[in-house]
Design a protein with these regions (language model features):
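Glycine- and acidic-residue-biased ligand/ion/polar-headgroup-sensing regions
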Residues: 49-68
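Histidine-centered catalytic micro-motifs
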Residues: 44-51, 86
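A short, N-terminal "cap"/entry segment at the start of jelly-roll beta-barrel domains
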Residues: 1-32, 116-117
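Short beta-strand segments in beta-sandwich/barrel cores
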Residues: 43-44, 61-65, 79
Length: 117
């Protein structure tokens, strides 16, 4: 038995709704890693991403809902590849705080996220 175990979480070229991811943006590469905590009952406002991003749910669960109402719930230990260019929001419908680490593959000063109505 090895002392090191590698467990793939995600290996895809599609977002969680099955849409193909766009090409990486031109310009100076910029990688951003964020840690977020969403309390039970809290809802992240409707927004859209201009760059590819993916994350791992460390604790709790998060339901992500697209502007068309398509939704998927991600639980602790699962990877999520976010929608790019499509308005969506996240909501913690669980009973404990959700903790997530998100990785963004951007370029230059491109915004990671923008509000959407």
């Amino acid at each position: 038995m090895s002392d090191i175990e590698i467990i793939p979480l995600v290996d895809t070229s599609e977002s969680w709704d099955g849409e193909r991811l766009p090409a990486y943006p031109a310009g100076t590469p910029r990688v951003t890693i964020l840690r977020g905590v969403v309390q039970p009952g809290a809802k992240v406002a409707m927004h859209r991403h201009g760059v590819i991003n993916a994350g791992v749910i460390l604790r709790g669960e998060l339901t992500v809902v697209s502007e068309t109402g398509v939704e998927r719930t991600f639980r602790a230990g699962e990877g999520v590849v976010e929608l790019v260019g499509t308005p969506h929001y996240g909501e913690n419908r669980g009973r404990e705080a959700t903790e997530v680490i998100m990785f963004y593959a951007g370029a230059g000063n491109l915004p990671l996220s923008e509000p959407s109505e």
